[in-house]
Amino acid sequence: MIDRKYIRLGEDDEDDGFPVFFPVLSVCEEDEDFKVKEDHMQEEMPILALRNMILFPGVAMPIMVGREKSLKLIRYVEKKGVYFGAVSQRDMDVEEPDRADLYDVGVVAEIIRVLEMPDGTTTAIVQGRQRFALQEITATEPFMKGRVKLLPDILPGKNKDHEFEALVSTIQDMSLKMMELMVERPPRELILSMRRNKNPMYQINFASANISTSIAVKQELLEISKMKDRGYRLLYLLHKELQVMELKASIQMKTREEMDKQQKEYFLQQQIKTIQEELGGNINDIEVQELRTKATTMKWSSEVAETFEKELRKLERLHPQSPDYSVQMQYVQTIISLPWGVFSKDNFNLKRAQSVLDRDHFGLEKVKERIIEHLAVLKMKGDMKSPIICLYGPPGVGKTSLGKSIAESLGRKYVRISLGGLHDEAEIRGHRRTYIGAMCGRIIQSLQRAGTSNPVFVLDEIDKIDSDYKGDPSSALLEVLDPEQNNAFHDNYLDIDFDLSHVLFIATANSLSSISRPLLDRMELIDVSGYIIEEKVEIAARHLIPKQLVEHGFRKNDIKFSKKTIEKLIDDYTRESGVRTLEKQIAAVIRKITKEAAMNVVHTTKVEPSDLVTFLGAPRYTRDRYQGNGDAGVVIGLAWTSVGGEILFIETSLHRGREPKLTLTGNLGDVMKESAVIALDYIRAHSDELGISQEIFNNWQVHVHVPEGAIPKDGPSAGITMVTSLVSALTRRKVRAGIAMTGEITLRGKVLPVGGIKEKILAAKRSGITEIILCEENRKDIEEINDIYLKGLKFHYVSNINEVLKEALLEEKVIDTTDIYSFGKKTEEEKAEKVEKTEKKQRKK
């Protein structure tokens, strides 16, 4: 950027009616080179140290003289009328510079005029003449003197150099353009003078002196001898500076336009406000009045009404252009949009409610019975606090979809929020209004969306709530799900109590283990366990197949699935307690048929079991079915996972070893390993009762294995199974055919109850098991299960391990190569033979 160092002289110094400005654009001939004649040079030239400026040949500029030595030099040069040398300092902060503080190249200069300024300072108007090389400083008092060597400025040859002419012209144009972009434009006289000056050296030096860059860069330009090279270097710097100036100008223009726009809008708003006030109101008043009118129809308490009116008065005092206006308006609109005292009318037709539940879901009798009971109480009493129900069970059994059916059967609105992965307490309680972008929590948002205060509210995946430094959402749910507290639920954003006691909350979970105990205590737990194969067949025939046919463009009866086909589909292509994967496999079959129909191929209208391999490929799963058992040490246990029950084979083998050892394999967890250790220790302690010789433990090593080693297994319920397996292996007694068991074992031989009984029973029935051994305390769990699940099963309830072994083991022994007892007898015979040999040796001696 070109520096604006113009000094206006007095009125009496005007020439031809124009004030004189500096730097002065000298009226010079086109070929003038500003050289100094050698005979005009002094042997020792006064040297003036310049701070923060560079003087170029031909350029005139003001120098503010501040240092005492510099003032003496100016007085001396003015009096004698001689030249002096102007050299820039490397560091402007140095007060007493020496040779090392000065650049190597300076400019011979002459004084045009010395001005005494009104503030008492002295300003010298000087003009550069020719460059020189500073050789040495010869004196420092009363001012610096030194020897110099003149340096020529090399112009192109006498023949016209069109490239150089174009270069100079470009520099001149860019300099003028930069003047036009300046915030305060230079005087018109300066611009006109620069346009008229055709001296190439002057044009280059003037632009070099006034470009906005560092002193070091300007000094670099001064030290370039060839004017053409100096011009190209200058052109690069000018181009760079011009880009910056154009960008600044663009930014300033945009800023100015934006400010003008804002001022215009402000004035228009003021005018509109004035006009509306003259007419009797304004926009703000109209909006507030509409809200106040709507508030008269609300069925809210006096506390809410007072709070709303107070917040509305705050809104009235705010200007619509205020940043707080939109925040306050949002809060007021949130209050008035909530369903205060608005309720859906319950449908008390119990038969219709039962038919809706039966239509949408097969089975799940316990859940349906609980909903009908709630409706019956409402019908008799007219009002009651809604229950907090938690449906827990494996995926795909219909827990979430059951909420929709319950809402339809009751005639209520349905809302659902997913809590999976939720880790911020503010998602439940909302954010305080002091935060930017604050809003109410998801509970209040859902009620706002429902439009009633008594919807069926599904809290999906409540067992997958997380917590972090932002808080624990499960703790916030304690207030929501407590019938004694939720009649005054406090949302941080709303800051007003809201009644949730009429909301029917239904939570869903896959497992109860990850839910906090206080939260569990507030909910009524209903086990939605898996379906048996007969139920899955009915669900597929009634719901899944018709649904998928319609979704794929068929009518409900266009394609038939036989019962055996559905059973094979369930057995060979799914492994779940629910029906989600079953629906996917049905959809896959129908897609294949849809493709046939779309290609005008004769498509299948009835799917047989043999067609499944064609449509779905080879069976994905092979069920662990009981095939009979003739081996000692192989016992069937029952396990339970989040996706349902499974049968579990536990195998025990023995092999000879030098020392006793128990080996456990099959990816077992710590609890299951402990069960094996307890089982073996119990057998050792009661070996006499079980008919097992202690010598066996000293000479045989025990290996317990649970197949499917890639799957982690853990839990205490395999305790009695491991005892039975070990006793069978050690005694070689056969295990009763078709029997499975589950239960925990103690060191005293007591059998303790376990969980997941229904899932385990379904797994046993699915695998062809006919008899099950359970703990006596699990009898109550069996009594709660529908008889349809128990058909074909015989239960043995036990309290100790002796009863387990009595029911599970036969007296018949397995005949195989592992002859433990012959090994024991052989050992005794060997000992007797050894003793006899020892006695014979002693007699011979």
From Swiss-Prot:
Q: Which SMART domains match?
A: AAA (SM00382), LON (SM00464)
The superkingdom listed in its UniProt entry is: Bacteria
The entry's ATP-binding residues are 393-400
Q: Name one GO molecular function term.
A: ATP-dependent peptidase activity
State any GO BP term from the record: cellular response to heat
Give any Pfam family that matches. Answer: Lon_lid
Reaction(s) catalysed (UniProt annotation): Hydrolysis of proteins in presence of ATP
Q: Is Transport included in the keywords of this UniProt record? A: no
Q: Where is the Lon proteolytic domain?
A: 629-811
Q: Where is the active site?
A: 717, 760
InterPro entries reported in the protein's UniProt record: AAA+_ATPase, ATPase_AAA_core, Lon_bac, Lon_bac/euk-typ, Lon_lid, Lon_proteolytic, Lon_Prtase, Lon_prtase_N
Briefly describe its induction.
By heat shock.
Q: Where are the transmembrane segments?
A: none
Q: Which Gene Ontology cellular-component terms appear in the entry?
A: cytoplasm
The alphabetical list of record keywords is:
ATP-binding, Cytoplasm, Hydrolase, Nucleotide-binding, Protease, Serine protease, Stress response
Give the enzyme's EC designation: 3.4.21.53
Q: What Gene3D superfamilies does UniProt report for this protein, alphabetically?
A: 1.10.8.60, 1.20.5.5270, 1.20.58.1480, 3.30.230.10, LON domain-like, P-loop containing nucleotide triphosphate hydrolases
Q: Spell out the subcellular localization from the entry.
A: Cytoplasm
Q: Which residues form the Lon N-terminal domain?
A: 45-242
- First-tier enzyme category under EC: hydrolase
Q: Which PANTHER family match?
A: ATP DEPENDENT LON PROTEASE FAMILY MEMBER (PTHR10046)
Summary of the function given for this chain in its UniProt record = ATP-dependent serine protease that mediates the selective degradation of mutant and abnormal proteins as well as certain short-lived regulatory proteins. Required for cellular homeostasis and for survival from DNA damage and developmental changes induced by stress. Degrades polypeptides processively to yield small peptide fragments that are 5 to 10 amino acids long. Binds to DNA in a double-stranded, site-specific manner.
Q: Which family does it belong to?
A: Belongs to the peptidase S16 family.
Q: How does it assemble?
A: Homohexamer. Organized in a ring with a central cavity.
| Protein name from the UniProt record | Lon protease
Give the organism the record lists.
Porphyromonas gingivalis (strain ATCC 33277 / DSM 20709 / CIP 103683 / JCM 12257 / NCTC 11834 / 2561)
